Amino acid sequence: NGLQWDLSENWLSPSSGLASWTYYYTNLDDGLTYTVKSRATDIAGNVQTSLGSDSFIYDVTAPTAGSVADGLTNEDQEWSSNLTTMSAIWTGFSDALSGLASYEYSIGTQAGGTQAASWTNVAMDTSMIDSSLTLSSGLQYFVNIRAIDQAGNASSAASSNGVNTDNIPPEVTAAFDGSAITDQDFQQDSTSMIVGWAATDSRELSYYSASLGT
């Protein structure tokens, strides 16, 4: 079990002349270190006294999932007009036994989905940006992250809270100068001007901006 070597264990002999072989053993305990030892016997019957040895940790426990945020800053991204690019950062993934080996991401129209991008390995990076996407305006997309440990176990997928895509610009439906509700062609005040407008958007308006010129 890695802590001691029991000399009463039975030695297993492969077929004569094999340099490597496979033995399937199913009664292993998760988290324990196991040691495999080997010895050679020559044609004269002499047995190797200095044993070959190698150890491994039996690990079938998946890593612990963390959290994912859309965008590359500490402020989570909620909206995007870019239909080819998505990005995300993540923290909090861990593995107590063999340790983390890599991360993978996918992008979908639902948490855990792969509709926009299949699972892609990003080594040990804790951020991603994919500029090869074909997204649709008016949908919500989620970035999903899973961790892979040194033994090949995958964590459950952690998902962002989603980015809403919208590349349809708002429409100004009316604009008024000289009054907030009706358009005026002349005014006497030379120090200020009242401007009014109305606008619509297929999703949600964020803010207005106005300029004045000749």
Put a short name on every predicted segment.
Residues N1-D29, E104-S136, Y207-T214:
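Recognizes extended acidic, P/S/T-rich segments that occur
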Residues T41-V47, I148-N153:
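Short, solvent-exposed loop/turn segments at the edges of extracellular beta-sandwich modules
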Residues D42, G52-T73, N82, G108, ...:
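Flexible, low-complexity linkers/stalks enriched in Thr/Pro that connect modular domains
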Residues T84-A88, T191-V195:
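Structural beta-strand segments of beta-rich domains
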Residues I89-L97, G196-S202:
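Acidic, Ser/Thr
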